[in-house]
Amino acid sequence: MTRHVYLCPLRWSDMDAYGHVNNVQFLRLLEEARVAMLFVEPKTADVMTLDGQLVVVRHEIEYTAPLVYRPEPIAIETWVTRIGGASFTVAYEVKDGEQVYARARTVLAAIDKESGRARRLAADERSWIDAYHEPEISA
């Protein structure tokens, strides 16, 4: 299992009237980390990617502590917990050392560019995604 770590800078505009990062902004931070793992960094390493053929099916976020603005980037660990026939689940932890600010999951589905319909993940895509696979532990 390999977790991707994205160091995400916070922006002043991420904060809300309560002085912490707004819940909606967390989705944007998670998107940045997910895009870095799936599309940006693999291309610089000349590795096959899904070429943008994904849609978000569902997001789930658990906020565990308020995150206030700071000049240092926040670490977002990203990995894959489930690989299905046409979809997979990406998990995240927004953290600083042992302090976890949020845990989240996103279900993504592969789509056909021409038809816009769901399609099965190809063997090479599954193999590439599997490099980040860490099965969830059931309680």
Which residue ranges define each predicted feature?
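Terminal targeting signals and extreme-terminal segments of soluble enzymes
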Residues: 1-75, 81-139
